[in-house]
Regions:
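Active-site rim helix/loop that mediates acceptor-substrate recognition in acyltransferases
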Residues: 21-55, 200-222
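A short beta-loop-alpha structural element at the N-terminal edge
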Residues: 2-21, 167-190
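Conserved donor-binding loop and adjoining core beta-sheet/short helix segment
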Residues: 9, 41-118, 233-263, 312
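Glycine-rich phosphate-binding loop
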Residues: 97, 269-271
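Conserved acyl-CoA
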Residues: 102-119, 264, 273-289, 295, ...
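Acyl-donor-binding surface of acyltransferase catalytic domains
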Residues: 92-174, 316-321
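Conserved beta-strand-loop-alpha-helix junction that forms the acyl-donor binding cleft
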Residues: 122-131, 261, 291-302, 320-323
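A short gly/proline-enriched turn/hairpin at secondary-structure junctions
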Residues: 191-199
Length: 323
């Protein structure tokens, strides 16, 4: 068995494509969106990113077994004034147990080394791949967050979570003070808030900053909930325009889709009502299926999504490390 370490560009394109198509990240699994067309699109995105990112491919006897990339995250680097990076586009081939550990350890070591120019780096790994998670932990990465990705049809019968007296409207400028207040008063799991290396107050404002970015750049739609005449919550909705234009599949983006409920409105059904409302909006925009990443410690959210017709798609575990 000969193990080689190469860059993406040094591996034949057909071999890299086969790795992605035969061992895809389980996006939209169990829905009509999980097609070969979607798999090819994800390969195209990874290939495009490989042209500008630091890349790594581990091969065994000339066959690509696992690949990943290191990239800097400009908006986070600018916000925190330090180089913040990510490890992504990770795809791993099913391997016999006797070679799995050695290859994974080789991969995690070399991919971690690519991040040496960053001060803080995160990696998201499919939850079932315990060996890969453990290998990154041996490199000094620690648990940050865990998410269950659930996928739901916009055609699913709803109207079961409509909360009497709740009004949902579009965001206006004056709402930002209330959003800021909600993030201060409502506990929520977030790696930049819980990690001791970041200022928690500034970390919370990062999420307010994201809402303003969506609002000012018109990246999507922000729904505001009012209950008994008071601000109750905010929810972002964004359609992946690049995917829609490239392969004619309309669905939501997989990040930047936060929801925040004000402390005075917690445990009253506001979040489910808002998600129901957003599903209706997605349907009106021609979206058939929506992905929702729920923190896997948030059992009420997961149960509520299940009642809305969302089904389990995949489990992700996020790890991070100060370099």
């Amino acid at each position: 068995m000969v193990i080689d370490i190469k860059k993406w560009d040094d591996v034949p394109n057909d071999k890299m494509k086969e790795l992605f198509l035969e061992n895809p990240y389980p996006l939209y699994r169990g829905t009509p969106l999980g097609t070969d067309l979607m798999k090819e699109y994800m390969f195209t995105l990874a290939k495009k990113s490989a042209s500008i990112n630091d890349t790594l491919v581990v091969l065994v006897d000339g066959v690509p077994m696992i690949t990943g990339q290191f990239y800097l995250i400009p908006y986070l680097s600018k916000y925190w004034n330090i180089p913040i990076g990510g490890l992504g586009h990770i795809v791993i081939r099913n391997m016999p147990a006797d070679i799995n550990t050695k290859i994974i350890d080789t991969f995690s070591l070399h991919l971690s080394n690519l991040a040496s120019n960053a001060k803080f780096v995160s990696v998201t790994i499919p939850g079932p791949n315990i060996a890969l998670i453990r290998s990154f932990e041996q490199r000094g990465f620690a648990y940050a967050e865990g998410f269950i990705n659930m996928v739901g049809s916009t055609n699913y019968f709803r109207d079961q979570f409509r909360l009497k007296g709740l009004v949902i409207r579009d965001l206006v400028e004056n709402d930002f003070d209330e959003i800021d207040s909600a993030y201060k008063k409502t506990p929520f799991p977030a790696r930049f808030v819980s990690d001791g290396g970041f200022d928690p107050e500034k970390a919370r404002k990062l999420y307010v900053h994201r809402c303003r970015e969506v609002y000012e750049q018109r990246l999507g739609k922000i729904f505001i909930a009012e209950l008994e005449g008071k601000f109750a919550g905010a929810l972002i909705g964004i359609i992946d325009k690049e995917m829609a234009e490239t392969i004619n599949i309309k669905t939501n983006t997989l990040s930047g889709m936060g929801i925040i409920i004000h402390s005075r409105a917690l445990r009253r059904g506001v979040s489910m009502h808002m998600i129901e409302h957003r599903q209706d909006w997605y349907k009106s925009e021609g979206v058939d299926y929506v992905n929702f990443g729920a923190n896997f410690n948030n059992r009420p959210m997961i149960l509520g999504l299940d009642k809305l017709g969302f089904k389990y798609g995949s489990l992700d575990v996020a790890l991070h490390k100060w370099i």
